[in-house]
Every structure is written in C-alpha cells, then in structure tokens.
C-alpha cells in the first residue's frame, strides 16, 4: 500500500428537522428566510447530490450523520419535565424560540464540526481532531458532545488518530471549527503544510472588533488548537478577519476566502491586514509556487460576495486540475459570474467552475463549503477508519431511499413541537447508524 495523502470531504447529512427559524444572528440568509417553510427531504437530497457530484469528479467523499433533534435532553436540563411529548408541548408554549434552537439541524454544516490537522503537520505523526464548542450561538453549542462521539466512532484507531475534547465553553475560547481554518501546501496534500487560523477577535481585547455582528472565533481558541495538535509554530499563521467583513455578514472566514494546496482565493476585505498576511504566506512558501488570487471590491462588491457565497465554494483538486464548486447563487449574481468567467479566461491554477444546487442550505446561510469537513489522510489512515462512511454507489442509493422514506417535504418551525417528528427522526437515525456501522452515538440509543 502506498502512503499517499488525500483530502477527503466528510459531508454532513442534512437532518430531518431542517427548518428556517432564523436563529443565527450575523447570518443574513438565516434571518431573511426566517419562518418560511422548509423542505427537509429536498435539502437532504441536494446535499447527497452534491456529494455524488464530487465523488464522480474523483474526489474522495464520505458522510457524517445528522444529530438527534429536537434535543429533548437539553430541554430537560433547562427545566422542562415530563415525558418527551409533554416536554415538547411545554417548550412550544413557554419558549418557542428555545424549542427552535433545540430543534435546529445546523450540524449539517460540517465545516463547523471540528478542526483537523493531518499527520504531516503534527509532531507525533497522528491526525488530530478537536470538535468545535460553538458557544456564540446556543443552538450550535448543543452539537459538540455528539460531534465528538461521531468523530471518535469513525476515527477510532488510536495509533493513527488523536481526539481532543472541545475547548472550554465561554467567551474566551469561542471555536467555530474549520470554517475559520485553511491549510496550504506546496502542491501535494501529504507535504508539510501551512495552517492558517483566522479569528474575529482577541478575547482579552486590544484589537478592533465588529460593531454590528459578533466575532465568533477568538484568537485564544485558535492558539489553543494549534498547541493541542502539536503543530510547529513555524507552520502556523494566526490572521485576524476584517471586522467590516463580519459586519457585512461574513460570520465565518469561509464566506470571503477559500484555499486549497498552493492557491488562496480571497476577497480584498477578507483579512484585517491583507498585505501582511500575504507577505507571511509568501515567506513560508519561499521559492515554491504559490497563487494568491485577490478579488477586489470593484470586481465583486463585498455585499455580492456574501449574498452569492462565491468564496464558499469548494476548491478541489481533480485529475484535470483545480476546480471551484460554487453555488448556483454565484452564477446568478452578475458580478460573481463575470469574475468567474474572467478567472477562467486568463488561465491559472483554477481550470474549471461547476455550479451546484444547494438552495435549501443556502437559504439558511450554508453554501457548498459549509456542508463539508476537509480531512487529509494517508492511505494507511484511510484503511484504519470505518469503510462504511465512504460514499459508494450503493451507499448513495441507500441514502437516497432512506431520505425519501423518513423525511418530510414541508416543515415550519412550529412543527418541531410535533412528537411524531421526534419519533420519525429517531427511527431514521437508528436505521442510519446501522447502515453506517457506527454503533450507538445518540442519547436515545443510550450514548452519553
């Protein structure tokens, strides 16, 4: 067996309670579509179609299961009592916003699940995983424990993988996972890389902060993860996100920048000090080839970048060169579409652009890149994880049938109070864990 390294996309399967409750402050699309009806079945099938599209391009593709929602255990911890049906009824009557938070399917956005460092970058030669604590938004803070269980179930081999507990919850160590992290290398995933951690604020002050929306990632969280993952300080860069970008709706840096191998595609407003950031990246690359592709405000206004999710596409390496997998909204935005045409016309490392329909996710503020967690693994490490999570033709067909069997095609936030929805979800997840060979990972299955 060769020990080449590959970047694998672990996509979150959209959960049965996918809805538009407008929970995410700072996420413009989430607020815009609040209280509209959603289509969980369509959302899950769109996500599955994206996975299959990437797999057909030759990209290695795997899945992460949804989380159990509504989170009745969380409602119990918050003072609601009785059986599941009674708890849902009381929560719907007394605090429907809290019920919506406990019913969110936001774990579908796997880019926020964790930060992952490949073995090539870690001093101990293992791949490291830290599940994100996501404390800024209550509905997302509920995900960390189950995310940890899922990652430990998939990457169970202790020789190859090291798992760290989520950072302490609170304002100092706010961690939003890989949505604020990218890794560059000099042309091959298996080479030593430069890990770029982008943060929105220093929890101890001293730097300008956004005025309108919260900065979700702290410098302290990023520094802690770099230490936990045994990274060489010479191969780590901490970069502050431009507060203006956050206030414009770029609540994660992957809304305004995306990197892959030796390419960084970024908006001119992405970083607080772009010249210094690029200088440090170029210094790390030295004589090795590096492509920085800046998109100016004149080419694509920041408001268009945020609404089109141009930068929230997936930048992937195919046999024919690098491809950008962008949402349909980027094609439909005149400035973004014009830029992409010009990008392809002038040549360069990005050889093709493909547009994908993930509109149900986009309406909640999650583009193609939000739906996946990038994990770089060697062939040896790939052989050490559960093979049942990789997207094969059989799994693709099986998941499609599973979605059509268990998911509703119309859901309002108020429907989260329906005890039948809870039972439908548990039945679906129980079947899914058997399909994926993950064992008991949910509270209703006895996991703790």
Which residues fall in each region the model found?
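The feature marks the mature, well-folded catalytic cores of soluble enzymes
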Residues: 1-448
